[in-house]
Structure formats: C-alpha cells, structure tokens
C-alpha cells in the first residue's frame, strides 16, 4: 500500500510540473497566430451574441458547437475582467482547457494501466508529458487534448464493452472536431459485434 501511494504522489507531482510548464510556455509564447486570433474572435463573439446568434450567415466558423462551447466561458471571463487577447493572461486562459484535458488524459491512462504501479506511472506520464502534446497545448494553445481525451475514453469504454458510454464519448469528440467521424465505423463494428456475439 505505501508503494501504491508513492507512485500516485509521484504521478501527480510530475503532472503538476507539466501543467505549470505549459502555463509558463503559454504565457511566454504568442502561439499560432491565425488560430489564436480566430479562437479569441469566436470566444468574444459567442459571449456577446450567444449560441443562437453565433453561426450567422456569412460569418466564418468551421468548428462544431462543442468547440465553441469551450470558448464561451473564456469569452465571458475576458469581457468581465476586460482582458486583452494579446496579454499573457489571455494566452494562459486559452491554453487552460487543453492543459486540464491533458491532465485528465494522463489520469485516465494511469488508471487503465493500473494505478499505483510502475506501468501506470510510465503510461500516464508518457501521455501527459509527451513533448508533442505539450507543444500543441502550451505553445500553440490548441484544444486538441480535449478531443483526444474523449477519444481515448471512447476506446477505454469499448474495451470494457460499455457501448453506451463509448457512444457518448465519441459524440462529445465529434461535437468538438468533425475528424471523429473517421472512427465512426470502428464504433459501429464494435456495436454490431457485441450484438452478434452476445449470449441469446
């Protein structure tokens, strides 16, 4: 039991350090300018117009409603506190959903591999501290980690034959990015296979 607690403490210590590093990177770097400016424009628009007025004819917005939903509280907070989108705080704010999702993804991998064990620690840290993912979130301020969290949760649920939970996670991923459609056939095959091989 003490060893299990030690692995858990080490895991969350590393994840906390990764989150702090991403916040520092987010505040110190400008991000991918085209996406950064677009995300903040969308955040402020949905905060001002609401969801019913966001997707107006002639207005460019190629993200599904789930992605805009993530931006809505950021826009509201920016309005409330009069935050300039060019400030370091605004950069950290935009990176926050991805950072939190990254910690959630790492925790999910840690649990799937066996919490309190070396393999769980290794897999969780490999997922949450991947340099590529840290760069995408901390430097580019993308929210791909939120999308990825739901996809991994979908496959984790499929592995346990929890089809309804898997469908919900896939639907959440699809609401964030249409690329989740690629995995639709995989989910369909799993559902059909479960129905076919279930005891009659």
Predicted features and spans:
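Transmembrane-helix signature of polytopic, membrane-embedded enzymes
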Residues: 109-131, 160, 164-165
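Short acidic/glycine- and proline-prone juxtamembrane loop motifs at membrane-interface regions
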Residues: 138-146
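Perimembrane helix-loop-helix junctions
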Residues: 1, 183-200
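Extracytosolic helix-loop segments that constitute the early lumenal/periplasmic catalytic or substrate-binding loops
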Residues: 35-62, 66, 76-83
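Transmembrane-helix motifs of polytopic, lipid-linked glycan transferases
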Residues: 92-116
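Short helix- or helix-capping micro-motifs
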Residues: 18, 123-131, 170, 174
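Specific aromatic-rich, kink-prone transmembrane helix
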Residues: 108, 146-163
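Start-transfer (signal-anchor) and selected internal transmembrane alpha helices
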Residues: 1-24, 111-123
């Amino acid at each position: 039991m003490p060893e299990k607690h030690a692995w858990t403490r080490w895991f969350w210590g590393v994840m906390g350090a990764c989150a702090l590093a991403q916040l520092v990177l987010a505040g110190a770097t400008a991000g991918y300018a085209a996406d950064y400016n677009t995300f903040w424009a969308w955040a402020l628009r949905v905060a001002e117009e609401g969801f019913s007025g966001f997707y107006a004819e002639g207005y460019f917005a190629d993200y599904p409603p789930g992605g805009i939903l993530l931006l809505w509280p950021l826009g509201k907070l920016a309005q409330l506190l009069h935050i300039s989108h060019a400030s370091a705080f605004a950069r950290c704010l935009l990176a926050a959903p991805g950072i939190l999702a990254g910690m959630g993804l790492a925790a999910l991998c840690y649990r799937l591999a066996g919490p309190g064990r070396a393999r769980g620690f290794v897999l969780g840290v490999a997922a949450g501290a991947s340099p590529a993912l840290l760069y995408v979130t901390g430097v580019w301020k993308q929210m791909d980690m939120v999308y990825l969290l739901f996809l991994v949760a979908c496959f984790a649920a499929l592995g346990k034959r929890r089809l309804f939970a898997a469908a919900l996670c896939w639907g959440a991923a699809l609401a964030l990015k249409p690329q989740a459609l690629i995995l639709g056939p995989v989910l369909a095959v799993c559902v059909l296979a479960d129905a076919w091989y279930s005891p009659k």
